Amino acid sequence: LVMAGVESGRDGHIARNNNCVYVCFIEYTYIGTSRINCNDLCTKNGAKSGYCHQFSEYGNSCWCIDLPDNVPIKVPGDCHLQ
């Protein structure tokens, strides 16, 4: 079976390039000093939707549904702040 033009996506905690998640409170996270809704962050990055995943293994962090493969998600290992 060959499928042409179909993009795959995956669900996961959207991450910055340093493998750090976007920490959220209720539904919002911060990018710099700007407050953004997790759903907006996810959809602006090509996901179908997103929400603040409360009490996850990475704390409260934005979870995206059907995020494109070219957008980083949290992978096992440390968050590299430097």
From Swiss-Prot:
Alpha toxins bind voltage-independently at site-3 of sodium channels (Nav) and inhibit the inactivation of the activated channels, thereby blocking neuronal transmission. Residues 1-8 form the signal peptide. SMART domains: Knot1. Belongs to the long (4 C-C) scorpion toxin superfamily. Sodium channel inhibitor family. Alpha subfamily. SUPFAM superfamilies: Scorpion toxin-like (SSF57095). The keyword Disulfide bond applies. This is Sodium channel neurotoxin MeuNaTxalpha-3. One of its GO terms (molecular function) is toxin activity. It is found in: Secreted. Its main location: secreted. Disulfide bonds join C20-C79, C24-C52, C38-C62, C42-C64. Gene3D superfamilies: Knottin, scorpion toxin-like. Has the structural arrangement of an alpha-helix connected to antiparallel beta-sheets by disulfide bonds (CS-alpha/beta). It comes from Mesobuthus eupeus (Lesser Asian scorpion).
